């Protein structure tokens, strides 16, 4: 059996990952890039990259195809466009980028370190009303909040 982290590490060499500072420059040079935030809607609503499209990971594959209730036409039509995937820490986007490649997306990238890294680099985020998010608020939001009961038990 493999853990999620092991699976992500195994497929990472097969995808393109981009650090936030490189993504900032890339987006300036490629304004046609579709930014897809694959976090859950409540995460996206709290803060996200301006002009990004929210397609939660759980419906991503359906959103990439016609004839589903989850279909996102802009995403379906983006197979030849640059697509930058974002999540909280870059793990979900590793799997998502791999899947999109299998589905025929020609230029899909994963934001390495995710929005946590984006925020650490002090790149702009906006809220649900597209208003700028204060960097300190973003730092607090992206701080690790793993509860004790969520941690792996110590080995006996």
Regions found by a protein language model. Give the residues of each.
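Rhodanese-like catalytic fold shared by cysteine-dependent sulfurtransferases
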Residues: 1-33, 41-82, 91-156
């Amino acid at each position: 059996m493999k853990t999620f982290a092991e699976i992500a590490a195994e497929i990472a060499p097969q995808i393109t990952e981009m650090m936030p500072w490189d993504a900032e420059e890339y987006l300036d040079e490629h304004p046609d890039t579709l930014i897809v935030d694959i976090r859950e809607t409540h995460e996206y609503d709290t803060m996200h990259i301006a002009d990004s499209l929210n397609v939660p990971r759980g419906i991503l594959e359906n959103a990439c195809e016609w004839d589903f209730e989850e279909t996102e036409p802009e995403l379906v039509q983006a197979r030849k466009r640059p697509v930058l995937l974002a999540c909280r820490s870059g793990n979900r986007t590793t799997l998502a980028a791999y899947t999109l490649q299998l589905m025929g997306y020609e230029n899909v990238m994963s934001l390495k370190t995710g929005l946590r890294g984006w925020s650490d680099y002090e790149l702009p985020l906006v809220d649900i009303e597209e208003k700028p998010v204060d960097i300190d608020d973003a730092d607090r939001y992206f701080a690790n909040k793993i509860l004790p009961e969520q941690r792996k038990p110590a080995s006996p």
